[in-house]
Amino acid sequence: MLPWLPAHRVAFPAVEHALREPDGLLAAGGDLTPAWLRCAYRHGIFPWFAPGEPILWWSPDPRLVLFPEEIHVRRSLAKRLRNAGFTVTFDHAFEAVITACATTRAAAEGTWITPAMHAAYYRLHIEGDAHSVEVWRDGELVGGLYGIALGGVFFGESMFSRVADASKVALVHLARHLAAHGGRLIDCQVHTPHLASLGARCIARTTFIDYLDQYVSAPVSSSLWPAAPSADGCTGASRHGPGADMRRGDMSREST
């Protein structure tokens, strides 16, 4: 039986209890407050649910990750980075990026970025833990991505493109920025050829949790993000003891 999480206590089951089918489904219930979200990501868990469903929490195995220094830029993409007239910014238009991710997906296949999810991640952005990368051309927002940053880990949430390769440009700039300022890992969630072509690879969930234990508390440059992650005091179970998705439509897939 799937565990139901009461909203008044921020705590998760150990990720080892996640279902194999559907892969990674761990629990239902809880809340989308900043404390819940910080606790979830810290333990390798993320929310994904369709409109009308309860909050569902996931921790798939294996996990797709990208080490920033391993970003792979093909010759054609390198040419677009140089010559396509893109300007890239960080945290200049977070709400516009998350709105674009939601509306672009909704037009194509439906979206998991409900108004409640939108509001939850915007609150995290205001508190300094959610960030966006924007890609502009001729003053218009043509691509981008957003996610959660805890210490040296960036947990990618969603990306979009309105012109060819704009989300790839955002990811390349994110990886280079993280590599230059102490970032250690980008969580891309589940395997796709699109992200694998950029250097992402699958690792076991146990290895992913080990990396979180190391990198979430790793020191990073103060110039990495404008605000440091807030403390949360959550409790969570992991294979190291207390405290120690398959998402359809996330960093693993590009909206166009």
From Swiss-Prot:
Catalytic activity: N-terminal L-lysyl-[protein] + L-leucyl-tRNA(Leu) = N-terminal L-leucyl-L-lysyl-[protein] + tRNA(Leu) + H(+); N-terminal L-arginyl-[protein] + L-leucyl-tRNA(Leu) = N-terminal L-leucyl-L-arginyl-[protein] + tRNA(Leu) + H(+); L-phenylalanyl-tRNA(Phe) + an N-terminal L-alpha-aminoacyl-[protein] = an N-terminal L-phenylalanyl-L-alpha-aminoacyl-[protein] + tRNA(Phe)
One GO BP: protein catabolic process
Biased composition (Basic and acidic residues): 245-256
Localization in the cell: Cytoplasm
Signal sequence extent: none
HAMAP family per record: Leu_Phe_trans
Identification of the protein by name: Leucyl/phenylalanyl-tRNA--protein transferase
Organism expressing this protein natively: Chromohalobacter salexigens (strain ATCC BAA-138 / DSM 3043 / CIP 106854 / NCIMB 13768 / 1H11)
Lineage: Bacteria, Pseudomonadati, Pseudomonadota, Gammaproteobacteria, Oceanospirillales
Underlying gene: aat
